[in-house]
């Protein structure tokens, strides 16, 4: 659906564009306390390997300033923090205060705070100067953004020339047998697990539907190019269930 129109998708529902942000906010307020459990259920625990791979694609160095966008509970930031060191900086930005609060508590409990900042921010209108970050990484967050092109353009603006964005997101399986199994798990079992474990079947159903509505690998690549990124590429993980996209700013 054209993101400039007055309606957009919320899972499989069509909703007014100005309502999607609040609806997504409600979902993540509902699941914030059990977000990591949600990721385990949605990925059978493999999300840790996917995140590790995404971080390797960032090619991080000591002293860099990194934006962990839609950083929520800090699961990527805790991997980034030791790689940039005390001379570096990790900014965790998320539109949802409940997710940020969970992340702040968890990282403090793990003793990770020296080079971490938390900022509540909208991905479509990032409150940072031009050419500010060496890298931007966004994990499992882009599909929940109302206007993805606006968010990508905002990311492009705040990345330094020579820097790049890494996007880790659920995508489209490339193997037909895997797709059939994955669909059965996602639509039949996962919402029931959400109801049983998190007492929240509807939020889990939205999360599954949001994955199906997210652009496929090539469509996202094209959207990144439209936003100004160059030399864009992607890696399929787990047969395309997840893809890691990367795009440069020159």
UniProtKB/Swiss-Prot annotation:
It holds the Pfam family Ubie_methyltran. Gene3D superfamilies: Vaccinia Virus protein VP39. One of its GO terms (biological process) is menaquinone biosynthetic process. The keyword S-adenosyl-L-methionine applies. Pathway: Quinol/quinone metabolism; menaquinone biosynthesis; menaquinol from 1,4-dihydroxy-2-naphthoate: step 2/2; Cofactor biosynthesis; ubiquinone biosynthesis. Disulfide bonds: none annotated. SUPFAM superfamilies: S-adenosyl-L-methionine-dependent methyltransferases. CDD domains: AdoMet_MTases. InterPro entries: SAM-dependent_MTases_sf, UbiE/COQ5_MeTrFase, UbiE/COQ5_MeTrFase_CS. Its EC number is 2.1.1.163, 2.1.1.201. It is an enzyme of class 2 (transferase). It catalyses: a 2-demethylmenaquinol + S-adenosyl-L-methionine = a menaquinol + S-adenosyl-L-homocysteine + H(+); a 2-methoxy-6-(all-trans-polyprenyl)benzene-1,4-diol + S-adenosyl-L-methionine = a 5-methoxy-2-methyl-3-(all-trans-polyprenyl)benzene-1,4-diol + S-adenosyl-L-homocysteine + H(+). The keyword Transferase applies. Keywords: Menaquinone biosynthesis, Methyltransferase, S-adenosyl-L-methionine, Transferase, Ubiquinone biosynthesis. GO terms for molecular function: 2-methoxy-6-polyprenyl-1,4-benzoquinol methyltransferase activity; demethylmenaquinone methyltransferase activity. PANTHER family: 2-METHOXY-6-POLYPRENYL-1,4-BENZOQUINOL METHYLASE, MITOCHONDRIAL, METHYLTRANSFERASE. Belongs to the class I-like SAM-binding methyltransferase superfamily. MenG/UbiE family. Methyltransferase required for the conversion of demethylmenaquinol (DMKH2) to menaquinol (MKH2) and the conversion of 2-polyprenyl-6-methoxy-1,4-benzoquinol (DDMQH2) to 2-polyprenyl-3-methyl-6-methoxy-1,4-benzoquinol (DMQH2). This is Ubiquinone/menaquinone biosynthesis C-methyltransferase UbiE.
